[in-house]
């Protein structure tokens, strides 16, 4: 399958490919805009996504040194105000304690690197690098539920971001190559600020991720259109804009039902689209 000339594999497109080949084909190859609601109620969903986007923007501005008082005065919405308050409580740890003195902070930074005949790209909420070697990846999550570690460790973001940092992040490390053992990825949940999830990287994980990503991309290149089949997990379809096109239903999934179902992780549904929005918006 020929990909668009300007196409780069992001964590969102890779997750699409793993979750549902058909969604990857429609969104990433055909780039089909489909006029469907992602989640009900529409206004509540749109408000929640917008506040998530606003939070990422505010966090970036705070980390580059804009006055906190000015940023705080711009808040609109209860969710955003709560997330922002939690972030401000956490912020001293990013600027003084941990990472602390000597750390360099890179907010909303993009990295890209070739892999075979394709390119990988990642948009990082924050990379913190210390001259003595540690490099931390922070990713802000605004979902109401805290995702389980067992789910996060399977996410393509958890595999791509540390791998890509090792491949392309030497300029963040005074020009020296970053070794996998220097890297740690931290998911910080705005609704659960005292319960971050941390993943320490390793050379073994780096090699496994390179093999996995290479195989995944090579598989895509060999596929014909008929090979981009629908997912067997039709729970994902309720929150996919292409559900009616694929004859997987017309009515959007209910946001309250999703958030109340402890067996369903929010990262597999609505949060996925927000991550893709964020990758584009801050580029």
Positions of predicted regions on the chain:
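Mg2+/Mn2+-dependent nuclease catalytic core
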Residues: 103-105, 109-215
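Metal-dependent nuclease catalytic regions and adjoining charged, substrate-binding loops involved
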Residues: 9, 165-283
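Active-site catalytic microenvironments for nucleophilic, acid-base chemistry
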Residues: 32, 61-65, 164-171
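A non-catalytic, helix-rich entry segment at domain boundaries
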Residues: 39-110, 114
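Anion-coordinating catalytic cores for phosphoryl-, nucleotidyl-, and glycosidic chemistry
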Residues: 1-8, 14-15, 114, 118, ...
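Short, polar/flexible loop-turn hinges at active-site or ligand-entry regions and domain interfaces
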Residues: 35-44, 69-70, 147-150, 171, ...
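A residue-level signal for conserved active-site and pocket-lining positions in enzyme catalytic cores
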Residues: 20, 55-56, 126, 185, ...
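Charged, glycine-rich intrinsically disordered N-terminal tails and low-complexity linkers that flank
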Residues: 1-61
């Amino acid at each position: 399958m020929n990909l668009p000339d300007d196409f780069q594999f992001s964590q969102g497109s890779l997750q699409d490919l793993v979750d549902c080949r058909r969604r990857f084909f429609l969104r990433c190859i055909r780039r089909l805009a489909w006029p469907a609601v992602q989640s009900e109620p529409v206004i509540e969903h749109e408000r929640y996504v917008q506040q998530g986007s606003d939070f990422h923007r505010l966090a970036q501005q705070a980390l580059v040194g804009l006055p906190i008082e000015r940023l705080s005065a711009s808040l609109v919405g209860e969710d955003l105000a709560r997330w922002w308050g939690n972030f401000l409580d956490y912020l001293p740890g990013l600027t003084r304690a941990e990472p602390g003195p000597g750390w360099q902070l890179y907010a909303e930074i993009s990295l890209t690197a070739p892999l075979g005949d394709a390119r990988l790209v990642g948009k990082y909420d924050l990379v913190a690098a210390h001259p003595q070697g540690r490099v931390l990846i922070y990713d802000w999550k605004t979902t109401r539920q805290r995702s389980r570690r067992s789910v996060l460790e399977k996410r393509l973001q958890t595999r791509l971001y540390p791998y890509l940092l090792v491949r392309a992040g030497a300029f963040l490390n005074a020009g020296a190559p970053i070794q996998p053992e220097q890297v740690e990825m931290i998911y910080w949940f705005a609704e659960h600020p005292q319960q971050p999830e941390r993943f320490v990287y390793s050379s073994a994980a780096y090699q496994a991720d390179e093999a996995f990503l290479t195989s995944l991309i090579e598989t895509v290149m060999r596929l014909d259109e008929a090979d981009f089949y629908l997912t067997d997990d039709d729970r994902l379809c309720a929150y996919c804009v292409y559900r009616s096109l694929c004859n997987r239903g017309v009515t959007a999934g209910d946001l309250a039902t999703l958030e109340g179902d402890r067996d369903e992780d929010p990262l597999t549904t609505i949060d996925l689209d927000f991550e893709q929005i964020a990758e584009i918006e801050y580029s």
